[in-house]
């Protein structure tokens, strides 16, 4: 009974997250991608909030709490037919908190790697032309180099200990990979399913074209093709014996 209850809760949560959009000009895939992106980052900031509370860093605790709340807001607005706004809001928010965290904790905190997640998200949910996406990629690369240059000339506001750096880097790595895997699965799932359907449909068409609809046996064209293959293998001594039986069902 307990397992059945958990299964029911899991189905309800899945149905809520994968709920379709009402706006005909927006896609379900984009909305679901943004929801999962915001949801994972909400959990990420909840974990960081606990870490900052453990370190007794009140300003950082408030900062992580605010970021988490903002991503909950980004998650919510995907259900209000504002997917485009949610996309822009989530990406700008990500750029903002990465900048603040680099300034506050320094390069070693590892949050700059979320720029890779941001780039993948932009490619997944954006419908712009290839040139625009390439331009966004170049700007993201330049911004990362700018952040690195900033940290070479400016000390962070808070000097984290080695243990704290390892802890935050570990958390960052886990959530970065979770974000990348999630976004890429959602982004590629539809295209892979469509390709699988096309392959299966082509195989069915090939089978129909090569068999007799009455008997289900090979038709004349497919039989000639099969015989040519067998004769070729026989002449190449890859087939020791070759037996051909011919019959006619029209009697």
Range-by-range predicted roles:
Residues 2-26:
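Short, Lys/Arg-rich, polar N-terminal cytosolic tail immediately upstream
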Residues 30, 46-69, 81-84, 109, ...:
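Alpha-helical transmembrane segments and their interfaces in multipass membrane proteins
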Residues 31-107, 115-122, 138:
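Hydrophobic transmembrane alpha-helices and their membrane-interface boundaries in multi-pass
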Residues 123-127:
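Interfacial segments of multi-pass membrane proteins
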Residues 206-225, 234, 247-250:
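Conserved nucleotide-binding and Mg2+-coordinating catalytic segments in signaling enzymes
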Residues 243:
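Cell-envelope/extracellular polymer assembly enzymes that use nucleotide-activated donors
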């Amino acid at each position: 009974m307990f397992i059945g209850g958990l299964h029911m809760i899991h189905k309800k949560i899945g149905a809520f997250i994968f709920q379709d959009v009402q706006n005909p000009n927006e896609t379900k895939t984009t909305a679901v991608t943004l929801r999962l992106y915001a949801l994972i980052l909400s959990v990420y900031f909840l974990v960081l909030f606990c870490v900052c509370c453990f370190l007794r860093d009140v300003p950082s605790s408030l900062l992580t709490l605010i970021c988490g709340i903002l991503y909950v807001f980004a998650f919510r607005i995907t259900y209000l037919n504002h997917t485009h706004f949610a996309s822009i809001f989530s990406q700008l928010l990500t750029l903002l908190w990465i900048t603040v965290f680099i300034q506050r904790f320094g390069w070693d905190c590892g949050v700059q790697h979320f720029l890779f997640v941001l780039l993948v998200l932009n490619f997944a949910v954006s419908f712009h032309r290839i040139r625009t996406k390439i331009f966004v990629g170049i700007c993201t690369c330049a911004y990362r180099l700018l952040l690195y240059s900033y940290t070479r000339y400016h000390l962070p506001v808070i000097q984290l200990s080695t243990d704290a750096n390892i802890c935050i880097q570990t958390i960052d790595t886990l959530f970065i990979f979770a974000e990348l895997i999630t976004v890429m699965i959602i982004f590629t799932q539809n295209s892979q399913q469509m390709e699988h359907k096309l392959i299966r449909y082509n195989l069915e068409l090939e089978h129909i074209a090569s068999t007799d609809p009455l008997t289900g046996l090979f038709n004349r064209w497919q039989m000639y093709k099969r015989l040519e293959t067998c004769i070729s293998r026989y002449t190449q001594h890859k087939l020791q014996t070759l037996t051909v039986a011919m019959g006619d069902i029209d009697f």
